Amino acid sequence: ENSINEKEVIAYYPGGKELIDQYDLNGVTQLIYSFLHLRGNKLAVDNKEDSLTILHLVSLKNKYPKLKVLVALGGWGGCKTCSDIFSSAEGREEFASSTAKILEDYDLDGIDLDWEYPVIPGVPGHKYQDEDKDNFTDLIIRLDNYLTSQHIISFAAGGFQSFLDKSIDWDKVMPLVDHVNIMSYDLYSQTKTGHHTPLYSVNNESYSVDSSVRYLTEIGIPKSKIVIGAAFYGRIWENVPDIKNGLFQNAKFKRAISFNELHLLDDGYNFYWDENAKAPYGFNKDKNEFLSFDNPKSVSLKAKYVIDENLKGIMFWQLGEDSPSNGLLEAIKNKIYSNE
């Protein structure tokens, strides 16, 4: 069994090379630079600035000996040509070989695939097709062939039913990857308020960390390959009626807000805790706005869940939205590395 101090604490990071130095990365096991994209059939670093950032992140391994640094492909809107390119054996092969070269050139520790999404619609207008599922499997097989056993291969999975059911051939993919990062956030709709990153589902229409984990364990995925997600940002809805403090009401998604900007919200917000979901939320009566987010208490409970369920670890999107002190990463580390 994983001992407590072997849990993964995985930070996605899309920021520049200066911002990262505000954060204490002791106890962070993986830093995933986000994102690289396809250029033709190849994995490519977008520009010189990104290249310098990656070099800086890799240099942090001197300061933090336990840190591994990965790069991620794609992201929301960042995988427009993935379905097309990965539909040919040549495209998959060239991607795998180019990935191996980038990892070697930059002294990186691995690749995280964040294709949103194989088989099912993601960004409007981006291609998806049934063949994506088998093509993804073959892509992983080829990556496994090109990379060394020291290299990490992971992928990000949607935490909602259609992705879990349709996008991935779990039986074939999971033996070849180190773990799956479940994106257990953005789980509620654009047109109704709710918890976007709850630990537990509270009604039959809500997804959660736990619902994704249950799904994967029930189809035989080992817990030692499951990483759950926390959100370092909140989601705000507007036009929310003053019923039940705004929870589960018809409304309109307005915007996201970083955890480190929550203090800028105006004074009209009252905050509440949903004991069933283990999730905080806020409601502003004057403005008819509803906020769903993760706070130190909720991420600490997610970290406790990782320990109690003996999962591989916890990841979050994204580090640059955290407060450098008394933030969410600190709360996660306090729980993961406490000797309880």
Task: Please name every model-derived segment.
Residues G91, L103-D109, Y117, P124, ...:
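Folded extracytoplasmic luminal domains of secretory or organellar precursors
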Residues Y13-G27, S87-D105, Q161-K172, V213, ...:
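Short, acidic/polar
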Residues L73, A230-Y305, A331-E340:
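Glycan-binding loop/region signatures in secreted carbohydrate-active enzymes
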